[in-house]
Amino acid sequence: MTRTPVNVTVTGAAGQIGYALLFRIASGQLLGADVPVKLRLLEITPALKAAEGTAMELDDCAFPLLQGIEITDDPNVAFDGANVALLVGARPRTKGMERGDLLEANGGIFKPQGKAINDHAADDIKVLVVGNPANTNALIAQAAAPDVPAERFTAMTRLDHNRALTQLAKKTGSTVADIKRLTIWGNHSATQYPDIFHATVAGKNAAETVNDEKWLADEFIPTVAKRGAAIIEARGASSAASAANAAIDHVYTWVNGTAEGDWTSMGIPSDGSYGVPEGIISSFPVTTKDGSYEIVQGLDINEFSRARIDASVKELSEEREAVRGLGLI
């Protein structure tokens, strides 16, 4: 193995998602089974000891691809030479907290991290924001990194995409491997729109196969959009392993490419496609190749879809205005 190790930075590394993520990165699932990695674990000062415990366990796995671990509470150190950054750590919403308060609290995290990425990361840096509100946190980080191409900042909607795949597979009596071209549009929030109108199930149009708009509107979309809350209700804690899995999927697909005839969903800076205002970070259908992505163009958007895309995009535009008003972008 003569390849240069890839520097992967994970923030919130001692948290539940971080714990579910790090061992999979170290085993080669993030970038590939032949790609050595060095891990940088960024945590807040009180959590450094817990991060050290996780690092001890990583050492004890003796992963052949893992060529070093560094633990720090300094973003400038964590992002120095980083090739891939997974921004997992975020301020969760607590009871009685308004959305503006949440955005402001997260601005205090993602603005300094964006600046550190701007000043210290490698030229080929790829950023995935997992910590919620992911789309707008990604926008805050991106705005603080003017020297980094905007398209390198992405937000995770792959968890929603994966959730939608399974719900559609269950409804149609198929497997997730049978489903192609599903799309998540908009925000990673309850307004997101999982779109099956261009999807196929075993080669046949998914919407025609389902042929049940009531199920689509009353069951499928709410189940996918509110799945996170349902998991908290059932588990007593938020999605961790499934979120980590989606982060792995997102980066692996970004780096290694989508399958022929298929696409995926990523939260990316809009170029104005499909009437989504330029600059907001919204989920789109994308194909990826050689570490780059392109929005799938030319899809017909019916009235059912248009109304739902517009509602989610409106929320994203409002979030952008809120963080602009707070001086975060």
UniProtKB/Swiss-Prot annotation:
Thermal properties of activity per the entry: Optimum temperature is 50 degrees Celsius.
GO biological process: malate metabolic process; NADH metabolic process; oxaloacetate metabolic process; tricarboxylic acid cycle
Residues passing through the membrane, by range: none
Alphabetized UniProt keyword annotations: NAD, Oxidoreductase, Tricarboxylic acid cycle
InterPro entries listed in its UniProt record: L-lactate/malate_DH, Lactate/malate_DH_C, Lactate/malate_DH_N, Lactate_DH/Glyco_Ohase_4_C, Malate_DH_AS, Malate_DH_type2, NAD(P)-bd_dom_sf
EC number of this enzyme: 1.1.1.37
Active site: 188 (proton acceptor)
pH dependence: Optimum pH is 6.8 at 50 degrees Celsius and 8.5 at 30 degrees Celsius.
rRNA-binding keyword on record: no
Reaction it catalyzes: (S)-malate + NAD(+) = oxaloacetate + NADH + H(+)
UniProt note on regulation of activity: Activity is inhibited by Zn(2+) and Co(2+). No activity in the presence of Fe(2+).
Residue sites binding substrate per the record: 93, 99, 132, 163
Highest taxon of the lineage: Bacteria
Record GO terms (molecular function): L-malate dehydrogenase (NAD+) activity
Annotated positions binding NAD(+): 12-18, 106, 113, 130-132
Pfam families: Ldh_1_C, Ldh_1_N
Subunit structure: Homodimer.
Family classification: Belongs to the LDH/MDH superfamily. MDH type 2 family.
Function, in words: Catalyzes the reversible oxidation of malate to oxaloacetate. Exhibits remarkably higher catalytic efficiency for oxaloacetate reduction than for malate oxidation in vitro. Shows a high specificity for NAD(H), being almost inactive with NADP(H).
Protein's name according to its UniProt entry: Malate dehydrogenase
Species: Streptomyces coelicolor (strain ATCC BAA-471 / A3(2) / M145)
Gene it is expressed from: mdh
